[in-house]
Amino acid sequence: MDEVLNLAKKAKEASKKLAQLSTEQKNRALLKIAQYLEENMEKILTENQKDLAEAKKGGLSPAFIERLTLNEKRILDMAEGVRQVAKLPDPVGEVLGMTRRPNGLVIGQVRVPLGVVGIIYESRPNVTVDAAALCLKAGNAVILRGGKEAFNSNLALVTLMEEALRSEEIPEGAVGMIKTTSRDAANYLMRLNGYLDVLIPRGGAGLIKTVVENSTVPVIETGVGNCHVYVEEDADLEMAERIIINAKCQRPAVCNAMETLLVHEKIAPVFLPQIGKALKENGVEIRGCEVTRRYIPDALPATEEDYYTEFLDLILAVRVVRDLDEAIAHITKYGSGHSEAIVTRDYFKARRFTEEVDAAAVYVNASTRFTDGFEFGFGAEIGISTQKLHARGPMGLKELTTTKYVIYGTGQIRG
């Protein structure tokens, strides 16, 4: 475990220097990272092909392979994402408030970096670049531990970023990667109090549960996305169909994709055959309740477990509900607090849904797929938090900072 400890020591030392960098220095480094990604595309793709070959040989699912895959467009998108982070306002040093006390003390609250951020994530190489860019802009050092299936891709990306940062004289250790796939290394990282300030897991329920239960470092839990769309009796059904197809089919392997569809019983006879046909045309396997199967005969029977499941695939659980009360009760029981949507024309039902559904993002007449840092205007995101402390929802730059109080006096002492 010496490698992990040395990485953490370098990151801790680098974090002190990163906190003092100017916005201009950080932006130059980010632009250099983007340049290196574009100039070394073939090298990245070659390493990614090694990972893909192993994944296919290991019989991993098409959805998993889709998340693992890099191509020219995705690398260009990564580079553009880094440039977008460079364009974002620097949160470090922002003065959040200033007050003068009756005794003359001036008390200010200032935004500062978290310090050293550890990220344990599954096999999505884009997370490697997004996380490094965001942490750098927020003045943090970062230690990355990606999934073993993306090891070659991640190593290529981190090596290029290290070269880019070195050329801009950014401290060594600003971006580090655990260069082993050993679980022991990940477990050791989780216990590095005093070196890591926060640990962020990104991935499926199993990974997140492991980190939350075993880490002694403070954790920001990025959540499982068991997301729902509820179609009310007064909904515009054409709009509902567009939203459902987008939320389920556009990119099913991501956490903001819909996993369960809830339909009001009064529109079920008309809407379920319509949406069932559209979903089938998009290759979706439907698992429905008894009423659902009456109107979509080829739907499979849904189990209790299906309603708890984040499928991350072209599989959808469907349930017919009596009313808004039952829809909210279902979401409360089975939902993961990520993203929930209602399709309705009724303002009061929409308002009640937004007030009573406890989730990081609650939508009225829109797809859950918008729960994303770019779509919210934050730039790239470090993850989507489903907890309430220290952040909730898409975590951008500000969520990678904390605050401290700076107090100016003229010799005051406390009586």
Swiss-Prot record:
Q: Where in the cell is it found?
A: Cytoplasm
Functional pathway = Amino-acid biosynthesis; L-proline biosynthesis; L-glutamate 5-semialdehyde from L-glutamate: step 2/2
Could you tell me the keywords of this UniProt record?
Answer: Amino-acid biosynthesis, Cytoplasm, NADP, Oxidoreductase, Proline biosynthesis
Top-rank taxon, per record: Bacteria
Q: Does the keyword Iron-sulfur apply?
A: no
Show the GO MF annotations: glutamate-5-semialdehyde dehydrogenase activity; NADP binding
The reactions it catalyses are: L-glutamate 5-semialdehyde + phosphate + NADP(+) = L-glutamyl 5-phosphate + NADPH + H(+)
Biological process GO annotation list? L-proline biosynthetic process
Cellular component GO terms held in the UniProt record: cytoplasm
PANTHER family, per database record: DELTA-1-PYRROLINE-5-CARBOXYLATE SYNTHASE, GLUTAMATE SEMIALDEHYDE DEHYDROGENASE
What name has this protein been given in UniProt? Gamma-glutamyl phosphate reductase
Instruction: From the UniProt record, report the name of the gene that encodes this protein.
Output: proA
